[in-house]
Structure formats: C-alpha cells, structure tokens
Amino acid sequence: MALFIFLILVGYLMGSINSAIIVCRTFGLPDPREEGSKNPGATNVLRLGGKQYGIMVMVFDALKGILPVILAKFLSAEPVTVAFTALAAVVGHMYPVFFHFRGGKGVATTIGALLAFHFIIGVMVAATWLLVANFWRYSSLASIASISLAPFYSLILVGNLNIFPPLFMITILVLYKHRDNFNRLIDGKEPKIKFKHSVIEEIMEASPATSAEQEFPGKEVIDTNIDETEKTEQAEAVKKPKVKKATTKAKKTTSKEETTKKPKSTKPKTKTVKEKE
C-alpha cells in the first residue's frame, strides 16, 4: 500500500510539471493558457511558436508519462499499480498543482505512459493518432480516436482485466477534456492542423497587401513600390548622361564657331600689312 501511494504521488507531481508553459516562458512565446486554443499543450504551442517548440513540448509531455511508469516497473509494482501510476501522471498533466490546476488534455502523456507500460500498445495508439491526423488533419479527432481505443488494445494484447479500469478512466478524462473540440467537430468549426513555422510569419506574409486591400476592396492588388523606385532610379540615370552629351555638343559647336571666326579676322590683317609695304 505504501508503494502504491508513493507511486501515485510521484506520477501526479511529475505530471504537474507543465512543459508547455515552461517552454513558452523560456523562449519568450505567448502564454498557451491565454493565446490560441488556450490549452497548454503541444498542439497549441505548435500553432503559437512553430514546429520545433511543439515537438519539444510533445517530447517532454511524453516523458512525464514514461518516467513514472518505468519507476513503477523498476520497483516491481503490480500491473494494476503501474496502470494507476500512469493515470496519476495524466491527471497531474490535466490538473497540475504547480499551475493552478490549469493543464493540458493529456494525450502525449497518455501515449508516453502506454509506451512504457506496454510498448506495442503505445505504438498502436500512436499509429492510430498519426493515421487519423494524416487523413483528416484534425488533432482533436486523432486524440479522441486513438485514446478511446487504448483500453481495447490492452485487452487484446495483455488480456488482464485489472488494468482495464485505470485505462478506461484515462479515456474518460481525455474525452472530457476534448468536449469543446467534439462540439466544434460536429459544427464543422474545428481548425485543422497547419504546419506553419510561426503565427507571426503568417501575419508578416499577409501584412504588405492589407492597406491596399482596404483602399480597393474586392480587387487584386499588386505591390509595385519596388518597381516604381527602380523605374525612377533608371530614369534619373538615363537623364544624366543626356545632359552631359548636350553640354558637350554645345561646347563643340561653340568651339567650331570660334575656329571658323578666327581665320576671317586674321586674313585681312595680313593683306593690309603687305599693301603698306
């Protein structure tokens, strides 16, 4: 009994370390509890910061489920105790004591705990998530489908009815956390997974045409500021040589006129000198 309580406490406290909030604070990202879907999980961090931060949070969340289960198996706990340790880690992720009981939805932590509990079950759940997400592009639908099948995968592969209740409780908690997503899926308002590097990049990509689109709504607007500046620079560069050529031509004409005028003025002078002699 003492081992059971100890493992439950360890699982809950490790699950309460919310990696999404820590990663966002460390790298200066928005608070996932206040921005995006307002869920401090890997998918929301993916939307807010990019793929690298989303993967980082996903790995940390999975480790929160892996480490307590490995500890329980290392201490030779019974399979039921190991399953309840996994449940405690998921509950800690959903309702963390360190972050005012506002946590994530527990999908990555559940998959990590299942990988440590029974590797094949964890692989099957992860493969189900990837297949559903690949075909329908809904993270919530993939989570609901994969976690819902976890207890039945355990019955098929393990065949131990004692581990079914804690795994079924994990499924109920995950479904409860996804209740809003479930309603949005029915209404067709659930956002799909977008593999953008950052939400800021989406804003920057759309920003150059916003002012022009407001002035000319309903029309395609092309940004020609760069082309116009290039044209003006080229025009100025072309005009400058023409002015120089014109000045050189004027100088040549004046010099020719001076040369033609000079002989006319000198010839009469020579004649007058000879006549005097």
Swiss-Prot record:
Uppermost EC category: transferase
Coiled coil regions in record: none
Family annotation (InterPro entries): G3P_acylTferase_PlsY (IPR003811)
GO cellular component entries: plasma membrane
Keywords: Cell inner membrane, Cell membrane, Lipid biosynthesis, Lipid metabolism, Membrane, Phospholipid biosynthesis, Phospholipid metabolism, Transferase, Transmembrane, Transmembrane helix
EC code(s) of this entry: 2.3.1.275
Description of how the protein assembles with itself and partners: Probably interacts with PlsX.
Name assigned to this protein: Glycerol-3-phosphate acyltransferase
Source organism (scientific name): Legionella pneumophila subsp. pneumophila (strain Philadelphia 1 / ATCC 33152 / DSM 7513)
Gene from which the chain derives: plsY
